[in-house]
Amino acid sequence: MQTLLFYFFFINLIFAHDLNVKTYKPCTIPSVFSEQFTSEDITTWRSRWRAPVNKDLGVWDLVEAPGSHLRDEYGLITLKSNKPHILISNLENPTTRQSSSVPIVLSFQVKPTKPWTCGHAYVSLVHQSNPKNVSKEPPSVIRFGVKKCGMFDYISLSIISYDGKVSCHLYDAPPSGLVEGRTSMYTLLLQNTTVVIRRDQSVVYTGDVGTNFFHSPTKWITHSNVSNGYYTSRNIMSFLLSNNTNTSSYPFSVNGVELDVWNENAGVFINNIYFGFSLSDAMKFENETFIAKKILENSPCPNQPSIQPFGILMMLVSTIYGNFKNLYNCIKRNTIGYIYNSIYDFWITEGMLFPMRNMDIFKITAISIGLSIPVFLWLLK
């Protein structure tokens, strides 16, 4: 058994070393939209991606993948802290799904290059009435990504009507699994009423649009297929994901892709964005853009210099500093962080979206604070 493990370990090292000397090349897998950056895009990417001009936004830049072992792999990185970073890329032609049985697949890769304290990273499909209008942010139809802030840590999925008045959120979402310095890949599959979420090529969530979403409005509207005009959760999802314009008020038609990142720290790196209508093509895209990167990021780099005595001392100092930093962040998160982050989640990002799996943590925190106050007041006497 030990011999077998030893063999596989060194096979990974050899494979990693082989990949290390190769150059990243964008794959040519069919898609509705695919963005894979290289050094050739340094001067041209701004012609494909634009930012709304009526907002105080952060700045993006196209840089070589930080810590990457593949030469010439590039991506977009955020440069400002505590600023929303928004970019929109128009599709060459507006696209509409042919039937509800055709899967909608949306995928992207994200890598926090600095500690992720609080923030989100979304990739959205948008519907713009005037794609050339850069004065405002277009409404999202499907918003997919990650959100990690204090006790909140999950993969976020929202489906929104074209007018923005109907919005449904996944309430039992899985954890994000984000790790500083590591690339995470997230893939969304919507087919009929089934929702599947993949993280790093593994299925982490399977649900149904009629039972696993909430925050639907209870408003009366006129609709030809609903006799009483009442929007149930399943009806909303059917309307939003359908393309039959004769029977649905909300056909699935999009003409743009949006990046939306906000974080307390800069340095959120995003690349390898994919949108299409084929699950098999999406899996090929995952294989060609992520497998090599995953192996390399999880393998020791064979080109690292040997550690000298002075290097050992610096490593020890760095370890001690890191421990104190982690202690400080832990105290901060469990005191002021809870209060601030809760306000952030309730009012800044998604209104009243509150994942059900975090409710117990919220209750325990509230009870702990409630019990601590009388003790604190007693000690002051």
From Swiss-Prot:
Record topological domains on the Lumenal side: 17-303, 381
Membrane topology: Multi-pass membrane protein
Disulfide bonds: 118-149
Signal peptide: 1-16
TM helices/strands, residue ranges: 304-324, 360-380
Primary subcellular site in the record, as a coarse category: endoplasmic reticulum
One Gene Ontology term of the molecular function aspect: calcium ion binding
Glycan-modified residues: 133, 192, 225, 243, 246, 287
Keyword field: Disulfide bond, Endoplasmic reticulum, Glycoprotein, Membrane, Signal, Transmembrane, Transmembrane helix
InterPro entries named in the record: Calret/calnex (IPR001580), ConA-like_dom_sf (IPR013320)
Statement: the UniProt record of this protein carries the keyword Lipoprotein: no
Family annotation (PANTHER family): CALRETICULIN AND CALNEXIN, CALRETICULIN_CALNEXIN
Protein name stated in the entry: Uncharacterized protein P4H10.19c
Native species: Schizosaccharomyces pombe (strain 972 / ATCC 24843)
